[in-house]
């Protein structure tokens, strides 16, 4: 089983941390990296905007940010460490309301999306085929999450 560290630094949304950890482990298991180490940070819009501005030069809140440890200078330093996923609970709640979905559904989807980025999937900088591949993998894994946790 992997090492999953979850820190909930926001107060606006109720988060079932134990369930979120189980969802994260399911994602790691289904991605064939059950022993990987993952850090998950749940924040509000103010904090994610600061992170987005400071690290990605985008001065606005966003739903999820991923920082992979197996990229750039850090490759090979900690082979089991996937990286960090940061989710804005405020944006997730807003997006869930707009889509008429439960908050947990959006939260689990964003966790999955972030982990797939850590595993090298890319829908932004890659080709259309890369985006389709990521979307297909998301659909496949999220169907399993829905079945088990929602």
Curated annotation (Swiss-Prot):
Presence of keyword Plastid: no
Q: Mind telling me which InterPro entries this protein's record contains?
A: MetalPrtase_cat_dom_sf_prd (IPR023091), YbeY (IPR002036), YbeY_CS (IPR020549)
| Residues that bind Zn(2+) | 113, 117, 123
The EC number(s) attached to this protein equal: 3.1.-.-
Q: Where in the cell is it found?
A: Cytoplasm
Any one GO CC term of this protein is:
cytoplasm
Top-tier EC class? hydrolase
The GO annotation for biological process reads: rRNA processing
Q: Does the keyword Metal-binding apply?
A: yes
Q: Which cofactor does it need?
A: Zn(2+)
Q: Name one Pfam family in it.
A: YbeY
Keywords for the protein's UniProt record, in alphabetical order? Cytoplasm, Endonuclease, Hydrolase, Metal-binding, Nuclease, Ribosome biogenesis, rRNA processing, Zinc
Name the principal localization, coarsely classed.
cytoplasm
- Note on cofactor: Binds 1 zinc ion.
GO MF annotations in UniProt: metalloendopeptidase activity; RNA endonuclease activity; zinc ion binding
Family assignment from sequence similarity: Belongs to the endoribonuclease YbeY family.
Role, per record: Single strand-specific metallo-endoribonuclease involved in late-stage 70S ribosome quality control and in maturation of the 3' terminus of the 16S rRNA.
Question: What protein name is recorded for this chain?
Answer: Endoribonuclease YbeY
């Amino acid at each position: 089983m992997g090492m999953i560290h979850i820190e909930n630094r926001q107060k606006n949304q109720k988060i079932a941390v134990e369930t979120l950890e189980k969802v994260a482990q399911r994602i790691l298991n289904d991605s064939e990296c059950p022993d990987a180490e993952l850090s998950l940070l749940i924040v509000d819009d103010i904090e994610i905007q600061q992170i987005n501005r400071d690290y990605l030069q985008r001065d606005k809140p966003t739903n999820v940010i991923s920082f992979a440890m197996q990229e750039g200078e850090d490759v090979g330093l900690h082979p089991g460490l996937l990286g960090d996923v940061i989710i804005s609970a405020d944006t997730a709640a807003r997006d869930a309301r707009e889509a008429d979905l439960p908050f947990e559904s959006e939260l689990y989807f964003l966790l999955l999306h972030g982990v797939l980025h850590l595993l090298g999937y890319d829908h932004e900088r890659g080709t259309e085929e890369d985006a389709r591949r990521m979307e297909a993998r998301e659909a496949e894994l999220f169907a399993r999450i829905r079945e088990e946790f929602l």
